[in-house]
Each structure stands twice: as C-alpha cells, then as structure tokens.
C-alpha cells in the first residue's frame, strides 16, 4: 500500500468516520466507512493531472463509488480548483453524473470557517499531498439533502454551505 493511501485510510478511520457534536452527532463523512467496507474506493496516486483526466474519462467504466486522485506534487490551489470547477461545469452541461471535490493543504477547514473540523495530528506530518475525490453528483446531492434534514450543516458558515451544497445542487439541476 502506498504511504499516501495508508495516510488517507488513517484520516478516514480516525477523523472522517468519527461522530462530531457540531455535525449533530454525525461523522464528517457519514458514508466513508461503508465505502471502505464495501471496497468501493479506488486510488490514483502521483499520476499527475493527466492521471486525473484519465480517471474522469474512465469513471463510468467501473463500479467504484469514489476515486481518490492524490498527488504529492502540489499544483497551485487556484489552478487545481479552476481545473476541477471547469470540469464540474462541463460535466453538468453535458448531463454527466459526476463531481470533483478538491482537498489541498493550502486551504484547510479553518480557511472555510469550519474550525470544528480541524484534524491536527491525524495525518502524517511527513507527507504532503492534495486530493480530488471523483464521485457521482446525484449521490453526493442526495446525501446532502438527507444530511440537511438532520441538522448536519447547522454550524457551517453560509458561504461554505453555499459552496459545498448549493453550488453542487445547481450543477446537478443544470443551472451551474
């Protein structure tokens, strides 16, 4: 197992899957554990932006719920975010049920106003990498709709909620 994959698995187990009072007692990612148990996570590590493009192109050819593209070579956050935003817009216009979500060490939970989601000390300080999660947009939005009803987003700043939930919903509805 690649060290980055091991680190992501640890982050998921020790943080994403752990209940949080500020999320109405739910874990940051209530669906992560099931994806691991069902072997629904595929990794693409250090394949460059070409590898990310390939994973997007080939997403419909497999049955994984999520592809985690990770890179220890860090593209500029604005550049990576712009690529993924552009892909998300194009996928929405084309009616393709897919969404890319960026995680970058230059923009953490506190930058998004989500201090309660800080995970200091959980991941390796020896590794630095960015990630893009590739998933089905409909499944993400259906999950968000369910989580909204549970009070999950109650402590999210409005601009973060808009970016994470409402902007994604607009893409799903074809109103990018």
Please state what every model-predicted region is.
Residues 1-176:
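Expand to "…catalyze enediolate/carbanion chemistry for C-C bond making/breaking, isomerization
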